[in-house]
């Protein structure tokens, strides 16, 4: 879906350099390692790491896919959409599309997650309740094409994403922003 060589990646140890070496001591299970205690709990428990959006846009989108030509999947998706709206009313849930829309080649609906707490509750729930459907999870970082490709995670079978319309949308948005800047 995406060529990782198109992007650069900061070191995962950024901000954690120059610390003492980790111990090689094994835990009681003999397999895992004993980790040194943290001085404070990671902020990732309460806010998404940069560059993921922590505002009104939402940190993650979850696109739940179904084959609109399969009556069983359409029925399951419709019931799942209702269940999500009832069990997770704090989440933003969009229309159930029974046809391709935007970069999505098949029927789907979208759910927005705003906090790590919501992510931690909803994704394990969805792993069980997605049934025969697939789900695309992606962060919202402002890099829409990369978010839908290189940063995407799938539950179930991966579907192709039509990145062409997404690229054109991004280009049009950037052009409009440039025109508005020029007017100011």
Describe each PLM feature range.
Residues 2-184:
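Long, contiguous binding/interaction regions
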